Amino acid sequence: MDARTLHEMKMTAYHRAVLRRMCSNPDLKRRVVQHLEDLMHRQPDMAPVWEAWCALLDRPEAEAVADLQADSVEGKRLRMVSPVTAVLYPAERAMVWRCVGWLIFLHHYLAAAADLGLDLEEQAAILGLDGAEIGTWSHAPPERMAEERLHGLRQVITVRHILTILKPVLSERRQWLETVNPDWEASPLALLCRGEGAVVCDHLARQVGPRLRAADLPRC
């Protein structure tokens, strides 16, 4: 992922987290509105942006998030010129950035699940969650998740990451998941679905070790 894409993702996740926080914290919304009124007087040349933000705050959360995520001039302007950060208390800012980290992690999971062709039933088996709930994550992500549920998400991300190195062709990755391994008498996907994803991840780690390049390793 290039730096520009990551920055856009962070900004979108940041404002999504703030909008969600405002829904549960009327005082935060009041401070943002008050700050917008002040900006209207101090920076009248930016009035169209401040007016767009005022309109955004009056919309339902899902619609407001859609506007912020829009790949358009208006959407990018809303993300880049934001009245929110200035009114956040330090504890609120820390909470929002924790939420940003979670949303980006969830984005990586959803991208990995899509890349591996995992349907909702398979994801439900891997994560131990309801498939219908998982199906809402792209537009209504959960605020948090129990630690024991995170193992499945990490395993899916790990499997996808290593397979992109071992098998650059998309169709080959899904084929590998579905092919029975004689040593396991089951396919990697079957192991993932019955809670034995650690076996799959360890196997892939041994396979990829000799092929790792400097660019594949984490940076300090």
What are these regions (language model features)?
Residues L56, A66, M80, V87:
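Heme-based O2/NO sensor domains and their adjacent alpha-helical segments
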Residues W50-L56:
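Short secondary-structure junction/hinge motifs that connect adjacent elements
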Residues D67-L68, S72:
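Short helix-coil boundary/hinge micro-motifs
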Residues D2-R20, S24-R30, Q34, H41-D45, ...:
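Non-transmembrane "mature" sequence context
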